[in-house]
């Protein structure tokens, strides 16, 4: 399957890009994050992130489909 991945904040910094298209056999955000975390060296544990698919927040075991847009959102701070 092909996915459009969007990264924000420190994840985008670490990946060196804000988005990428990736071919993967991952069938859940959990599996896809494990793959890209290893590839890009992401340090965040999955429990600290939010994930959205096609504009809606979903759980880590949500079933992915070809051409889904997947967004991994790290915690942000500010004031």
Predicted regions mapped to residue ranges:
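Ubiquitin-like/PB1-type beta-grasp interaction modules and other compact soluble beta-rich domains
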Residues: 1-78
């Amino acid at each position: 399957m092909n996915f459009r991945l969007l990264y924000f904040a420190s994840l985008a910094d670490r990946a060196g890009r804000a988005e990428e298209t990736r071919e993967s056999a991952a069938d859940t955000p959990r599996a896809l994050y494990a793959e890209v975390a290893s590839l890009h060296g992401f340090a965040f544990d999955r429990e600290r992130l939010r994930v959205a698919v096609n504009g809606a927040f979903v759980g880590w075991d949500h079933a992915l489909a070809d051409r889904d847009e997947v967004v991994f959102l790290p915690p942000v701070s500010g004031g």
